Amino acid sequence: MMSKLGVVLTICLLPFPLTALPMDGDQPADLPALRTQDFEPERSPWFDPVKRCCSQDCRVCIPCCPY
């Protein structure tokens, strides 16, 4: 009986491998520190209001100005 169950599971899972499912690790990386708080780049000391981007320290201030 167990061997029949194994054959059925193998036949069912063979065309649909578990790697086809999207995993959390496949998601693009983002900045978790900025997600957990209300981040306002306009209040950052590096934010340039004319260009509407951050001129320095792009690790903590987004959007970053192109050089």
Swiss-Prot record:
This is Conotoxin VnMMSK-03. Disulfide bonds join C53-C65, C54-C61, C58-C64. The cysteine framework is III (CC-C-C-CC). Classified in the M-2 branch, since 2 residues stand between the fourth and the fifth cysteine residues. The modification 4-hydroxyproline is found at P63. InterPro entries: 4Fe4S_Fe-S-bd, Conotoxin. It is found in: Secreted. GO terms for cellular component: extracellular region. Its main location: secreted. GO terms for molecular function: ion channel inhibitor activity; toxin activity. Residues 1-20 form the signal peptide. Keywords: Cleavage on pair of basic residues, Disulfide bond, Hydroxylation, Neurotoxin, Secreted, Signal, Toxin.
